Amino acid sequence: MDIKEVWKRITSHAGELFYTKKGVPYTYHISGQRIVLENTNRNIPYRDIERALSLPDLSVTKLNQLNVQGPSYLYGIITDRRIIG
């Protein structure tokens, strides 16, 4: 999926409830080119989303290996049907 479309969907669903793969609920807001997680002090930069979308088969483990910020949270966002369509 195109990063611009994914980012547009991510921004439009800011403030809504999302879940990590293990079911931990969280919300986020957008600040510039970052996802700011509201239940932790983590920020996920736009470039980490780009890197995650480049993976042929997405998993939390693979996101961890990419050394992205908040891999469990990022996974929860970019695999959610509101974001991927």
Task: List each model region and its residues.
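Intrinsically disordered, charged low-complexity linkers and terminal tails
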Residues: 1-85
